[in-house]
Amino acid sequence: MTLPDLTWPAAWHRPAFRGQLGAVVVLLLLLTSQLPRYFAWVQARPGRTLPDPLLAALPAHDVSGLTFAVIYLGIGLGVTVLLPRPLRLLRALWAYLGLHLLRCLTLYLLPLEPPPGLVLLRDPLVDQLIYAAPAPITKDLFFSGHTATLLLLALAVPVGWRRWGLLAGTVAIGTLVLVQHAHYTYDVLAAPLFVGLAWWLSGAAVGRTLFRAKAQP
């Protein structure tokens, strides 16, 4: 679906836009409030260790600093581009909600143990606000949320250098979490499939009526 770029005043005049924006913000806040308890349960469950020939051949290194520099620069770029474009922002928020729900489902269905040689990936912000628990969360594996987030932003921004930059960041993050042994190779390779599904579903959630507007130059 091609997204026109309405201004905020034009979008805000549409009751459907206001309703959907309010709904997705409330749902994201509700989900965020439940994630600490859910991830603590995920961490407490026993799981399987998967064979991973690539990780077995790849020495583990702590690249947390570089990983989160790329992630937060990418998020900053994506948010900066999306904030002046309310319809793109709305679809991105619905897709992000869908992505988290899909990830909660896959974590429920596929309990896994961390890859051998895991080097703990430390994110002070998320560890304190989302994954807050007595012990670090290491079993939130299938699929890679870090990789998926940047790829989702790449889909949400307009075509151009910013999309290419976010795609490059996605590849970098997928590589870095493997170097860290924070994810299995399967987690990284599966992320684009779930991003594509969440993005497609977000188009249906927002509805075509919101996009019947003349695109800005």
Residue ranges and their predicted role:
Residues V42-L50, L83-R163, T209-A215:
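Membrane-interface loops
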Residues A190-P217:
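C-terminal membrane module of polytopic membrane proteins
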Residues T67-I71, L93-Y96, L166-G169, I173:
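Hydrophobic alpha-helical transmembrane segments of polytopic
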Residues L66-G74, S144-A148, L189-L193:
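Membrane-embedded alpha-helical segments of multi-pass membrane proteins
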Residues T2-I75, L112, D123:
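N-terminal transmembrane-helix/juxtamembrane module of multi-pass inner/ER membrane proteins
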Residues G76-T80, T147-L166, P192-S202:
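Membrane-interfacial alpha-helical segments at the cytosolic side of multi-pass membrane proteins
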